[in-house]
Amino acid sequence: MTRTKNSSPIDSLVESEPVRDAARALIDAVQREASDRTLSPESYQKCIGELEQMRGRPLMFPMLTSGAGKGARVRMADGTMKLDFIGGIGVYAFGHNDEDLLEAAVVAAAGDAVFQGHLMPGPEAVRLSRALLRHTGERLKHVWLALSGAVANENALKMIFQKHTPADKIIVFERGFHGRTMAMAELTDRPAFREGLPLTGNVLHVPFYDPEDPESTDKTLRALEDHLRRFPGQVAGMCFEMIQGEGGFRTAPREYFVAVMELCKEAGVAVWVDEVQTFVRTGELFAFRRLELDEWVDIATAGKLLQGSATIFTEDYNPRAGLVAGTYAGSTVGMAVGTRIIERLEDEGYLGEEGRISLLGRRIQRHLQSLAKRMPEAIGACVGTGAMQAFVPWNGAPDVVKAVLEAAFEDGLILLGAGSNPGKIRMLPPVSTTDAVSYTHLTLPTICSV
């Protein structure tokens, strides 16, 4: 894989041909060994059972991966192959065992530290921050790296509250998802995800866009205005998802977001965009930039495909010392691989309306719509953008979604559900895959006949 050359000494290690040759030799040796190691069916099931017992609950799917595979195809520890269209819930940019990313990972792993912190960052933190800021526009000038998307969102929330103190309320959309920490569980509109947790009562909800309702935008604006009227000076910010990931891949047109963001700005409310799941998958690194919403956004968060997470913010939201910190800024390997992912997206034609990600999304949409014509009762609404695609199976009832997911897994296809009323089957395929088109075309008629 051709690498971008530059003269910066900070890039000298990863660009060194002898180092890369050594990395490739190690990768080859590991993969040869991995391909020869297969658990017997009995040992495989025993390992799964032991892991489930230690976890205290079953795995969603009874599987253990082997560390081998290629692209969307992943090898289980018992030697069977499956097609992974969920990518570890959206973290595999170019699929499994991408040689170029493995090379970047091996070089980084041979360095001084497994993890990097905010006290002692390394060159990988510089390179990743620099790569991110190439895609954030003129207003978002700063980046703070972290481990998980939830932590990036926590940092965004703290920056907003500090800037707007003493305001203590945040507005979110119904059906949104923002993470599983205490604060993010309250922002997430899924009561089952916060069962038994104490709530602050400082999270306010507004309805998200409904394409079937011509008054949808007005309903959102009225709800937002009502909150602002009831709590004058108490609302610090509003969090947006450009596409509601866990909420069923629901999205909205640019004019909807503009109207809502304009009202936020008029009221002095921070605009925060949660792009943990949408990062890269819509055909640009940030979906808000694809929709040309730069002038309204104060803070954005990224994760998943980044191999870590980040909070990106304007100068106005630059926090005072002590507000955001922590032992870990991310893993050295994650930073190196995240940087390499961005470089390849830039260099290999993935970005833009005619880029490979957008073309992949359009191909999947065409195939899903073709299947919907053949099986109109089994495959309903097909939604998505780029490498985020979903469809409603049958009536979208929870038991139907569960049955389709189980049938898909047994047939060798890993998918996940999303949303409710109706539930959907979602796909987060590698952005480089071609399997996502051909295999779904052959397999979905079988699994949707459950």
Positions of predicted regions on the chain:
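Conserved N-terminal phosphate-binding loop of PLP-dependent enzymes in the Aspartate aminotransferase
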Residues: 2-442, 449
